[in-house]
A protein has these predicted regions:
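A generic local structural motif
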Residues: 45-50, 72-73, 121-123, 179-181
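Non-catalytic C-terminal accessory region of glycerolipid acyltransferases
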Residues: 2-38, 103, 107, 118-225
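A short, well-structured juxtamembrane/interface segment
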Residues: 33-58, 67-71
Length: 225
């Protein structure tokens, strides 16, 4: 998904940098992820289902980095009315992720993953104005875990667009020893979804802060340990 990231529009030629055996390996990984995702038993009550499928206008879909494993399956099941764009590093390594995103149904936008710079914001603003959703991991790609960088609010403020916060609770999952303790759910396990839709401004007309987003996302994304 869109990490905090200056950028340029995704260039199909850059995706083709990953070829041959490497591209075949990515295809196998993407196929495994799709099959794995379909075994998961997503649970959401009626109100949550409605919020997860929110489609009144283009939105920023926000999920913690350590829950990305289920994002593609969430998009497939609930985000059926719009394409979802995700920011990917403009580096050579980013070509791998861009190709992988294409294979799982996301549209990559190439750019820096180190700072949410002016060019990054401009490109994502244009994506939303064209009628598409964007995916954002507010604490990615390097953390700190569960810290929302203020830059992620730039795009929604400029478009006066809502944030669809996606909370995920895993009933059974492995956790990696990465900076974010990344979750990998067991096949056929239950995944509990929660959701909160935040407007660009609150009821008093005040702009959302990074702390507002962090508190709301933590509240719907409980950890088991």
């Amino acid at each position: 998904l869109a990490h905090n990231g200056g950028l340029q529009n995704e260039n199909p030629a850059s995706i083709n940098e990953v070829r041959g055996a490497r591209r075949a390996l990515l295809w196998l990984l993407a196929a495994l992820l799709r099959v794995w995702g379909r075994t998961l038993r997503f649970e959401a009550d009626a109100a949550t289902h409605e919020r997860l499928s929110y489609a009144d206008e283009p939105a920023a879909l926000v999920i913690w980095h350590n829950r990305l494993f289920v994002s593609a399956e969430y998009f497939r099941r609930y985000r059926t009315k719009r394409s979802v764009y995700a920011l990917v590093s403009a580096s050579k390594d980013g070509a791998w992720l861009a190709a992988f995103y294409r294979m799982i149904g996301l549209i990559p936008v190439r750019g820096s993953s180190s700072n949410f710079g002016r060019e990054a914001g401009k490109a994502l603003i244009e994506v939303m104005r064209a009628g598409h959703d964007i995916g954002i991991t507010p604490d990615g790609p390097r953390g700190p875990m569960y810290v929302v960088e203020p830059g992620v609010l730039v795009v929604t403020r400029r478009n006066n667009a809502p944030m669809v916060l996606v909370g995920v609770e895993f009933t059974r999952a492995w956790r990696l020893k990465s900076w974010d303790r990344f979750y990998i759910p067991w096949p056929f396990s239950r995944v509990i979804l929660r959701c909160s839709v935040l407007p660009a401004k609150n009821a008093n007309g005040e702009k959302l802060s990074a702390d507002d987003v962090r508190a709301a996302l933590i509240a719907i994304s409980p950890d088991k340990d």
